């Protein structure tokens, strides 16, 4: 697991308090802490992420060095006090450790010196491992399923041979998607693990990229370039949710500025106030004592109520943000067996009084009539061609409460007509796209990420045509959304970078996060100028706020 490097300032590092007029002044106000980052290899270094954190605080603030190697924290972001400073720059370590003291109405200068690292492997992102390891695109595509629970570094550092890998993969496939290295959770449906020998081909490949037959990797470790230009113009604030097993998955921000999230690792919905740093957790009922715990999706309905799934617990839920009251809607007993894994909701029930969801274990779609509490079952993948088993990732409802489905195995977008029950499938232009998460706008256009293809597709439901947007290689986007200016924002579990794309030009900005950030759902707050981007750090129990400076 990669970690940030902590510094303690020594006499060899320049630290001083100076009159404000001699310091760099940002557009956000006077700098509280500033300095340059240098190395013998490069001199002044652009694209180094510098993080300031107070001991005992749950808040860390980060900025990135510009073309002159300078970083600067606005006074409004750092209260007076002592701060530990950490950095992120792939290929480099700190030459001298350090900390800095911020004083009222003055600017502290702390220059930082870096040296070449002797342990590059510990700094690589999942994307950089994908760049480095040998293999065909088809072979590497299997690894895209691994990063939901752990890094690819764990695979590369392992010593399992092919026979051992067949057992390991079968064991992993028997764990729920909510599992994490410190908390594996076996599913009730043991059949989903498969048999070890069915993973032989993948096991053979894994044994060629790890340390099973050698004491060092037989391939070059490759890295992504550091941020440059607009990539460096952002302030990132991370909020630690404290519990190690907490995994903020889906994120929403309400009109009062509270951040709501589902806990992918525990049975809680969280409400966090970034102003007061108060965290309120709403315990969610367990329906199956031995089933995996954790929640995935969270959405507001038309009345401002929060709907969520309980995954392996087999129920939907609705939380009233005003009262804290929670209502539950368990799946009907005739459908609610050990295979059930309810993910996502289709929420325009103001149209016809019905709510949609789907089960991963059976690939069934369910629709609940809220008035009668009766459930309907659909199996829409029956109409898809192919010998392979198709899987639906997300479901989401449009304004007429028609259900849209992102088909993950190959890459289709599907629709169930709410009135006629007719199923229609639309193949995404790029083959093997792996359609993943969606957003539906006010015009009922469907935005869907192409996980394997590193693209995002916009489907016009009136013309029934796709427009595809290409993201940087190895992005493998999880979810995306447009902001009020028409720009596209995407999250990833691979590069530790938030991607911002201008659809008119195709130009992208990539904001590097301060630490290992496995991102899931994105939330773009259009009430600010520039907009504010929110996401959960799913494997690091944090909520992340990114504020672009332009």
Please provide the spans of the model-predicted regions.
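Beta-rich, blade/repeat-based domains predominating
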Residues: 244-256, 288-303, 335-352, 384-400, ...
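Blade-level signature of beta-propeller repeat domains, shared across WD40, Kelch, NHL, RCC1
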Residues: 513-550
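Extracellular beta-sheet/turn segments enriched in Thr/Pro/Gly and aliphatic residues
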Residues: 101-124
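Short, acidic Ser/Thr/Gly-rich low-complexity loop/linker segments typical of extracellular
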Residues: 55-72
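The canonical Cys-X-X-Cys-His
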Residues: 142-153, 202, 206
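A short, solvent-exposed loop/turn motif at the edges and junctions
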Residues: 55-58, 80-99
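Structural motif
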Residues: 36-45, 78
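Conserved beta-strand positions in repeat-built beta-propeller and related beta-rich domains
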Residues: 259-265, 306-312, 355-361, 403-409, ...
């Amino acid at each position: 697991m990669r970690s940030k490097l902590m510094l303690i300032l020594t006499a060899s590092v320049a630290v001083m308090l100076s009159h404000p007029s001699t310091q760099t002044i940002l557009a956000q106000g006077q700098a509280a802490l500033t300095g340059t980052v240098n190395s013998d290899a490069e001199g002044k270094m652009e694209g180094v992420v510098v993080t300031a954190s107070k001991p005992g605080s749950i808040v860390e603030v980060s900025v990135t060095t510009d073309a002159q190697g300078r970083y600067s924290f606005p006074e409004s972001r750092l209260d007076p006090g002592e701060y530990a400073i950490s950095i992120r720059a792939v290929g480099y370590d700190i030459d001298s450790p350090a900390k800095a003291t911020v004083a009222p109405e003055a600017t502290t200068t702390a220059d930082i010196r870096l040296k070449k690292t002797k342990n590059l492997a510990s700094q690589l992102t999942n994307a950089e491992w994908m760049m480095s390891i040998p293999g065909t695109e088809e072979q590497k595509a299997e690894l895209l399923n691994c990063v939901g629970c752990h890094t690819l570094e764990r695979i590369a550092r392992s010593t399992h041979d092919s026979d051992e890998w067949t057992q390991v993969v079968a064991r992993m496939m028997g764990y729920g998607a909510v599992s994490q290295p410190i908390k594996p959770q076996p599913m009730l449906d043991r059949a989903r693990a498969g048999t070890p020998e069915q993973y032989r081909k993948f096991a053979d490949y894994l044994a060629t990229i790890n340390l099973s037959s050698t004491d060092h990797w037989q391939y070059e470790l490759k890295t992504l370039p550091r941020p440059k230009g607009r990539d460096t113009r952002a302030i990132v604030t991370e909020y630690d949710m404290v519990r190690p097993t907490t995994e903020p998955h889906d994120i929403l921000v309400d009109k009062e500025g509270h951040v709501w999230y589902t806990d992918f690792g525990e049975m809680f919905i969280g409400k966090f106030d970034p102003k007061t740093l108060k965290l309120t957790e709403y315990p969610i009922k367990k329906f199956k004592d031995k089933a995996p715990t954790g929640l995935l999706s969270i959405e507001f309905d038309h009345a401002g109520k929060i709907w969520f799934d309980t995954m392996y617990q087999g129920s939907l839920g609705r939380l009233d943000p005003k009262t804290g009251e929670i209502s539950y809607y368990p799946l009907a007993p005739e459908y609610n067996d050990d295979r059930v894994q309810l993910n996502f909701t289709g929420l325009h029930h103001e149209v016809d009084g019905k709510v949609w969801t789907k089960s991963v274990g059976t690939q069934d779609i369910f629709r609940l009539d809220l008035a009668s509490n009766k459930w309907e079952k659909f199996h829409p993948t029956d109409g898809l061609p192919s010998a392979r088993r198709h899987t639906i990732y997300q479901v989401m409802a449009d304004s007429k409460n028609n259900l849209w489905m992102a088909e993950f195995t190959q890459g289709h977008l599907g629709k169930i007509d709410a009135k006629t029950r007719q199923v229609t499938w639309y193949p995404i232009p790029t083959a093997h796209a792996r359609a993943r998460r969606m957003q539906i706008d006010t015009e009922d256009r469907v935005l869907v990420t192409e996980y394997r293809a590193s693209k995002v597709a916009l489907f016009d439901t009136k013309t029934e045509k796709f427009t595809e947007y290409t993201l940087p290689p190895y992005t493998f986007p999880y979810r995306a959304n447009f902001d009020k200016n028409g720009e596209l924002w995407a999250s990833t579990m691979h590069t530790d970078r938030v991607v911002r794309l201008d659809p008119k030009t195709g130009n992208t900005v990539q904001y590097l996060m301060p630490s290992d950030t496995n991102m899931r759902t994105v939330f773009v707050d259009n009430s600010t100028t520039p907009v504010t981007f929110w996401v959960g750090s799913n494997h690091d129990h944090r909520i992340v706020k990114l504020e672009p400076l332009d």
